[in-house]
Amino acid sequence: MITFKRVLLLCTLSAACGGAFAQKVASGVVLDAETKEPLIGAVVCTSNGQKVVSDLNGEFNISVNPGERLSVSYVGYENKQLPIADTQQRTVVKLNRGLTLQEVNVVASIASARNKKAVGADVAHLDAAKLLAKGQAANLSDLLDGRVSGMQMFQSNGKVGMPIRFNMRSGATLSMDRDPIIYIDGVRYNNSHTSDINTSQDALSALNDLPMDDIASIDVIKGPAAAASYGAEAANGVIVITTKRQSGSTLERGKLAATAKISVGWSNKAREYTQFVNNTDINNFFVTGHNVSAYASFTKNFTPGNQLFFSFNESHNGGIVPGNKDVRHSLRAAYDMKQGPFTLNFTVGYVNGDISIPQTAQGRNDAIWNLMRDQKPWGYVSERTWRAMKWKYDNDRLTAALRMAYVLPYDIKLETQLGLDLNHIDGLYTLPYGYLLGTNDEGEKSISNRRNQNLTWDWKASRRFDLGHKLHLTGTLLSQIVQRRETMDKTSASIFPADVDNIAAAAQRSVLETSFEQRTWGLYGEAFLNYDNRLFVNAGLRRDASNLIGRNVASIYYPSLSVAYNMEKAKLRAAYGESGRLPYPTDAFTYYEVKGMSGYGPLLVPGKKGNDNIRPERMREIEAGLDWTPARHQIGLTAYAQFTTDAIIYTPL
């Protein structure tokens, strides 16, 4: 009996030891398949339900039994199954991003870009490179309209090169415009329209200066709550455009990659006008428009972290209105370098455009007005005169951005960026001698010269603090200087001698000169709290000072707060923020007009009375929303309320 018990005990111990030795430890690291960055908080579980979470370096260790499988998951990424045989040694698990609401990084504030799941406000992201790989867009309106909820974009009329109008969630009042501010690669972009020689409805659009094929992604920050970190000009929202920095996928060392694309298209009027009346004049007036575009890009990877990108684009667009043409040539280069704790990014782009804009918004003297009135284009203006008149712009634009970053001891990150946007536009309008317009058949000519300059200089410092096992805090402080300058001089002349169009020979001449400068300085502080990679809280405060506000107003403060909580396939979010709209350049100052001459000099009267106490319009917004991703679809719901104070109202003197 004793022998039997000993044998039974020995068998039991052997079985236990065998089970213990059969169980092994699987170790590895979880990485983003595209960026190779470690994924913190990825869930690794076995078939029997045992779970661990990857650490700050994306690493994990878990006990497994023979025959089990490992499942690795992370919010915003596709799940991956691994046989135990693949995990006997240290394994690198690369997860691909899935089609979920958290799949991309977006601009969370002026100071940071984060995974979308960490953003508590309504920010839309558009992968422009993927869309343009499947088709062609003539302008920003074609690319964005209908793809971003809560925003509509359209051209002011059907001609090529025309201004793009925005109808998006904003806080603008009746006195101010509704256009958002635009950043391209961190540079404040001058998106004002030019109408120096023509009407505002037929102005030259600045947004056409960016080749569509150079755009990598677009983030649309909607409403004052989301855009509060941008301060006194962001009540209409912000559009952040990031351009391409490489051709195709990631390159190996020493490799060269190239892409080329040619697009050809045609456009016609929406429909033939044949109902009820004979509209031959309308149908024959319009022509077939065309679009021809050629694009090429090259990328050279010299060493890891040392890469050069170059692109060229040429486009020829013709509208359906006779004489409407837009020809543009653009060059762009980008250089990226990373050596240890130092990072450098440089981007430079140049665009030259020649555009012809026949007028269709000047009342009785244009063909379209007469078409709408009498179904005939030549009611008050002859076809000979209309086709002889010319409105042309020669446009040159240079944009450049230099960014440098360095990681100090204790993981303190310093970053500075200098951006420049220079725009030179020459305008020319001619009515040749011998062509009757109204009562003038002796010629008319206007020339304009415009210089626009935007300078942006940012400094930023940030550091991450680990407050506990699952709690992390990132503090950021940013200083931003924005300077805008615009100067324009215009000379108009009429009544020329026969076949002479030199302005000096005209009997009547007039000169106009305008200029303005805006200087804005903003200081922004931000605290970002991350708990368990699911709950995110962001609090920020911005202080702005500008030469456009009244002399009795020292500065303006704009607070913001947002919260996001993530579940497996949904995100709850809420945000509150304040932002503003700066007054127009002359709102804070009184200026005078000449109303005649006297023996003592010109007679001056107030043309506009400024307000020493004027401050930016302030928009307060609170929003709450739900983002849900069922069965590889995306559903977003947002409710918001806005409140406006300090509204700017204009009254007669």
Model-based region annotation:
Residues 61-63, 187-222:
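Short acidic/polar hinge/loop motifs at secondary-structure boundaries
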Residues 45, 49-52, 57-59, 107-134, ...:
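N-terminal periplasmic "start-of-domain" segments of outer-membrane beta-barrel proteins
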Residues 91-93, 147-149, 212-259, 293:
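A beta-strand signature from Gram-negative outer-membrane beta-barrel systems
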Residues 142-190, 217, 227-244:
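Extracytoplasmic beta-strand/coil segments of soluble accessory domains associated
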Residues 273-281, 362-384, 428-445, 485-513, ...:
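Surface-exposed loop/turn segments flanking beta-strands in extracellular/periplasmic regions
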Residues 282, 291-313, 317-324, 328-398, ...:
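Flexible loop and strand-edge segments within Gram-negative outer membrane beta-barrel domains
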Residues 31-34, 42-45, 73-77, 88-132, ...:
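Short, acidic, small-residue-rich periplasmic hinge/interaction motif at the N-terminus
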Residues 379-399, 507-524, 587-636, 643:
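Outer-membrane beta-barrel signature, preferentially recognizing the C-terminal barrel domain
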